[in-house]
Amino acid sequence: MKLSSVLLAVFSLLIPAAVFADMPKVGDVAPAFQGTDQDGNLVKSSDVIGKNIVLLYFYPKDFTGGCTKEACGFRDRMGDLQKDNVKVIGVSFDSADKHKSFIAKYNLNFTLLADPDGKITDAYGTRMMGMKMANRVSFLIGLDGKIVHVTKSGNPQVHFTEMQAAIDQIKK
């Protein structure tokens, strides 16, 4: 019985490492991406990286508790983020139409990209194992196109706090 408990504990510790193993790390060049936004427009990483600091965040699903809290939190911080030349882009497997409804309902003021095939999610290593859903992970991409900070937490508040601290470091 003790051996099975130990094996279960070890296995549970290895799963997160395996899930995030292919995720870009601080200092890596951010993977190029392109996706359709809520208005049906094609958005490419080359359109924003180099012009803005990019806060690229992945989240599980529109209209769910934590995802709504996170989106509204970025919305409410947009004034400060814009002053710091930060462009927020959210990514999930949801459709562009669903993103449009989500934006309308919560008055969101930033871009959401539809990633129905998971190409962006997979490029950033954020897919939930075996699912068409992303883990809650945020990447801060500097003007040079390199990853400056990565936050992996189910708690949206941690994303706000860590991203703001990383943005403040860039400004110094």
State where each predicted segment sits.
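Short active-site neighborhood of thiol/selenol oxidoreductases, capturing the structured segment around
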Residues: 48-68
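N-proximal helix/coil linker or "cap" segments that precede and/or mark the start of modular domains
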Residues: 3-32
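Short loop/turn microsegments at loop-to-beta-strand junctions
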Residues: 30-31, 53-54, 135-137
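Thiol-/selenol-based redox modules, centered on thioredoxin-like
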Residues: 134-172
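A short beta-strand-turn-helix
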Residues: 33-53
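Short, acidic, Ser/Thr-enriched surface-loop or helix-capping motifs
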Residues: 24, 37-38, 115, 141-142
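Structural microenvironment flanking redox-active thiols in thiol-disulfide oxidoreductases
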Residues: 68-106, 118-120
